From Swiss-Prot:
Protein name, UniProt field: Thiamine import ATP-binding protein ThiQ
Entry function: Part of the ABC transporter complex ThiBPQ involved in thiamine import. Responsible for energy coupling to the transport system.
Cell inner membrane keyword on record: yes
Molecular function in Gene Ontology: ABC-type thiamine transporter activity; ATP binding; ATP hydrolysis activity
CDD domains: ABC_ThiQ_thiamine_transporter
Family that this chain belongs to: Belongs to the ABC transporter superfamily. Thiamine importer (TC 3.A.1.19.1) family.
Amino acid sequence: MLKLTDITWLYQHLPMRFSLTVERGEQVAILGPSGAGKSTLLNLIAGFLTPASGLLTIDDVDHTTTPPSRRPVSMLFQENNLFSHLTVAQNIGLGLNPGLKLNAAQQKKMHAIAHQMGIDNLMARLPGELSGGQRQRVALARCLVREQPILLLDEPFSALDPALRQEMLTLVSTSCQQQKMTLLMVSHSVEDAARIATRSVVVADGRIAWQGKTDELLSGKASASALLGIKG
């Protein structure tokens, strides 16, 4: 279980404050207007930002000040952060060992994830030789191979065409279900959110303004639907 209790980040002296509970294996979409604090929320969970106050626990362990490298979380951005001079295999391998000295079990795990992502025939290529969708598959594989209990997505597929984006969302959702991972995904699209998340959280003005069923948001019946430009 992921639990945030009054986690506070001071942005230009204006506090953003979040309280949220997400169960193990749950898939949750984080929606809201631009600048509302969605990415800030993910960065606080990942440890890239240190809160001024509040408590963040994962499976009842306090991780409020745990550095990102030691936090049981993986995060995928729109910018995939692949190393251009490393092969696909090496980029994925970094998720297992920063020194890329993989034992037989780790090699097997890496190739299994690559097969699951449909990139096992690309392992010797460099990122510059891949399409945008292929690069995101590699970045996702690097996240999944770490087998952390929580996966955070900050609009990683927004630059892809609609068909490819839907394919990647399905791949993420299925992979998280198989590994029993908790998924939190920032998105500007309620339609994308509805594909993988039955529950949504709406962020506005640095607060969680609403949380509930994604279908209710999409129908326009939720109090926060108007914040997303959805009319009932």
